[in-house]
Amino acid sequence: MAQAPARYDEFAEWYERWIGDAPPLIAAHSGLLPAVTGERVLDIACGQGRMSRYLARLGADVAGVDISAAMLGKARAVGPEDITYIHADVTRHPAWWDGRPFGGCTCELALMDIDDLAGTLSTVTTVLRPGGWFVASIVHPCFPGSERGRSSWPSGEGYEYEGWWTSPDHNPEGVRIRVGATHRKLSTVLNALHDAGLEAERFVEPPAPVPTYLLWRCRRR
């Protein structure tokens, strides 16, 4: 498969201004994280390092990986220096990996930015030790027809549509009009986790009139 596109490179400056260091899902993630003090943790699609820094503050030994050199530049500029940032495509075999297993992996609101889900999850199971955990979040896949989500869906399409999309009508100040997203049905996501050798332990839908996000914790079998 061709290398994944680094869609955020063009928008790194804008994205940093737009989201800053706001932690919209940090609290929800924290409820799923096991104890991380002293644990090697890989933050997948780490962007400007928001989750990586949170994990480091909890005492984890953190590495962050991202395809966007521009976003990694933002992460390195903030620090701290004891976080290792890696410029790599997570959908490919992790040639950058030194072979020492990670105890956990995180991926905050990024799997819908990555075209090759199976390749990404293969990286997760490759670098995790047996029993290692994977905590991740995505935009909730189940509500494209809701009032909240309708304007962000491709014209004439619905839940069964799977693929990459952008919408010129959805939140002109937001991220999806710029970088788009890959929609997958809930069954596609759950089956991909299972097929990768990741056993689901817990799912969370943060409270909202219409669930906006889906989070989970899995373990490598």
Would you name each region that the model predicts?
Residues 95-105:
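A short acidic, Gly/Pro-enriched loop at the edge of an enzyme's catalytic core
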Residues 196-198, 209-221:
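Core SAM-dependent methyltransferase catalytic element
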Residues 42-44, 48-93:
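Class I SAM-dependent methyltransferase SAM/SAH-binding core
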Residues 103-117:
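A short SAM/SAH-binding and catalytic strip from SAM-dependent methyltransferases
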Residues 118-133:
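A short glycine-rich, Lys/Arg-flanked "PGG" loop and its adjoining helix->strand segment in the class I
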Residues 179-203:
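Short alpha-helix
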Residues 1-37, 50-54, 71-74, 92, 133-168, ...:
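Conserved class I S-adenosyl-L-methionine
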